[in-house]
Amino acid sequence: MNWLSRFVSGTRPELPAAAAAKIAQWQEGERGEQALPHFETRYVVVNTEATGLNLDKDRLLAVAAIAIEGRSLKPSNALYRPLDDDPAEGLADLLEFAGHAPWVVFNASFNRKLLERVFEARCDFEPDVTWMDLQWLMPALFPEFHTGQVRLVDWMESFGVETFQRHHALGDAYAIAQLLMAALGRAHDTGAINARSLIEIERSRRWNHRTV
């Protein structure tokens, strides 16, 4: 049985008061401006840790996030939340930390879908945020390294990126954040000066991939 089945409509328990308050505050917030230059934009790398890669069967174990502000990466500006049997508090903390900044993931087909599914099952909504997927953006910005959608470890090797622990929500988030820093630098140098430009690059690459 899917581990989220106990949270489906009709059996979903009430949210803890603290989590409900954080979610309500987030829902009242305003989305960030996508036209600001990168050094004025707060980007948040969001990553998950799960028991496996099966969206229907595997369980979300933890969420992590690292903020990049002013094109500056500080490991202390981070969030890590292991999720127990009730993920409500961890999800609420993620919303509070990430806010309405662009949420940057690597492999949205898994991480985004998993997060949206858990949010819907436990909190009865999917966060309406701007998602960006480095798995698509990196080959568009650095075709000299890879031209297709490759694994995170491949990009880490290309850039000499290291982290304190692989296959850990925060450890991999730190690696992704370092790649995002490189992506922001290359994007700025090539005239993609804001989040809106990066969104268009990703959208164009996905469209071209579908039409090939």
Model-derived segments and spans:
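Conserved DEDDh/DEDDy metal-dependent 3′-5′ exonuclease domain
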Residues: 76-144
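Active-site-proximal helix-loop-helix substrate-binding element of RNase H-like nuclease domains
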Residues: 139-177
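Acidic two-metal-ion nuclease catalytic site recognized across multiple nuclease folds
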Residues: 1-32, 181-212
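Conserved RNase H-like, two-metal-ion catalytic cores of nucleic-acid enzymes
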Residues: 35-93
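Short, polar/flexible loop-turn hinges at active-site or ligand-entry regions and domain interfaces
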Residues: 122-128, 163-165, 188
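Short, glycine/acidic-enriched loop or turn micro-motifs at the edges of active sites
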Residues: 50-52, 110, 136, 175
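A contiguous, mid-protein "functional segment" used to position or interact
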Residues: 46, 165-191
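Active-site catalytic microenvironments for nucleophilic, acid-base chemistry
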Residues: 121, 140, 158, 182-186
